[in-house]
Amino acid sequence: DGGGDGQTTNIQNKGSDTMLQLAQAWSEMYAKKNPDVRVAVSGGGSGTGIAGIINGVVDIANCSRAMKPGEAEKAKEAHGVEASQFIMGLDCLAVYVHKDNPLEKITIEQLGQIFGEDGTITKWSQLGVDPPEGKDEIVRLSRQSNSGTYVYFKETVIPEGKSFKPGSLDMHGSKEVVELTAKTPGAIGYSGMGYATDEVKMLLVAKKDGDKAFAPNNENALSGDYPIARPLFMYTLGKPKPHVKAYIDWCLSPEGQKVVEATGYVPAPKK
């Protein structure tokens, strides 16, 4: 903390890589409005943010998954208070392919067959499309296991009790998945819809064969029609301190929620 009259209040905000762009945008805008408050934002994954709360070194953990019962228990044991949960917005996990891939839509089951350990889909021709640039082999891009995105995709797409098929390229962050997909004609990967570029295509996703396939967008995420959308959370230890609460309240205000939309996420459902 700075000395003298120009006292700066620091808020340590760590966690989800999915939320990193959003958290940085919030922090910058808040600093302009409140020059005496500095929100220090870092990534590292949802699990890292929660570990930071449990260890008492982080004020706010950003999470793209809900806190696990074991984590909540640890936080309570360490500090004697329950963690508080705030829903800050929604993230639509898009399924990305190369922009020249002729495939337009996919089902949850097909994704499980591509990414799951018992899955039998390994070639684009099995999905009824001519392989992009003659590259028929499907190149799977995934995330590391400390990522909330990895956990959520696994729970949603891969049959219960099963793991990811080995041999995927596991990327550090959301952005890297999209960047490598853009350079790899045979690639398929998953990442927040906010990371889309002109170099990739987002597939429509259907819950099951014969169902209507929906695009990843705000409307379909809020209605529940798009099957791979999830809440984005902030967690604090116990009730947040006044300066931390003021920040979270601002992030949830109409002004803060505009930032959510501007960074490609879905504003939090109205209470």
Can you say where each PLM-predicted feature lies in the sequence?
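Exported/periplasmic ABC-transporter solute-binding proteins
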Residues: 1-91, 96-271
